[in-house]
Curated annotation (Swiss-Prot):
Keywords: Chaperone, Cytoplasm. This is Putative prefoldin subunit alpha. The keyword Chaperone applies. GO terms for biological process: protein folding. It comes from Aquifex aeolicus (strain VF5). SUPFAM superfamilies: Prefoldin. HAMAP family: PfdA. It comes from the Bacteria. Molecular chaperone capable of stabilizing a range of proteins. Belongs to the prefoldin subunit alpha family. It is found in: Cytoplasm. One of its GO terms (molecular function) is unfolded protein binding. One of its GO terms (cellular component) is prefoldin complex.
Length: 149
């Protein structure tokens, strides 16, 4: 004999509680994604600064006097030796000597990868906002049903 499963009807309050939990979860996810985007934006800014600094030093040429920040508000004078070679971090505390062009190319590729990741996270946020809109519509329906009673 087949047993019939009886669907337990949720009260409007239970439905609203469940919808509110889902809404809070989506909002928490959005905030987490925004925090990740903020970190990515800072990394992109740092990489662009590095690229601009390398370009400026290359244009400056060898033998020019530059000021190097050493912390707080202190700077020291130094002479530019050019940027024919750049020491770049390649991960986990390891650095490698690269030509200027290789270093700039690597920086640009990192920026492009981070921008692609940022776009993906922004799309995920947009999807979450769409889900929130759907949930809000359900909240309105439940509220209207409750008001009719």
């Amino acid at each position: 004999m087949a047993e019939e499963k009886k669907e337990v009807q949720k009260t409007p309050e239970q439905k609203m509680d469940e919808l509110n939990r889902q809404l809070r979860g989506y909002m928490a996810n959005i905030e987490a994604l925004r925090a990740e985007i903020s970190v990515i934006n800072q990394s992109i800014t740092d990489l662009r600064t590095a690229e601009a600094t390398l370009r400026s030093l290359k244009e400056l040429g060898k033998g020019k006097e530059v000021l190097i920040p050493v912390g707080a508000t202190a700077q020291i004078k130094a002479k530019s030796e050019g940027v024919d070679e750049v020491i770049m971090s390649i991960g986990t505390g390891i650095s490698a000597v690269m030509s200027y062009d290789e270093a700039v190319d690597r920086i640009r590729k990192e920026i492009a990868a981070l921008e692609a990741l940022r776009r993906a996270l922004e799309e995920a946020i947009a999807d979450l906002y769409n889900k929130i809109e759907e949930l809000l519509e359900e909240v309105r329906k439940v509220g209207q049903e409750e008001a009719k009673k």
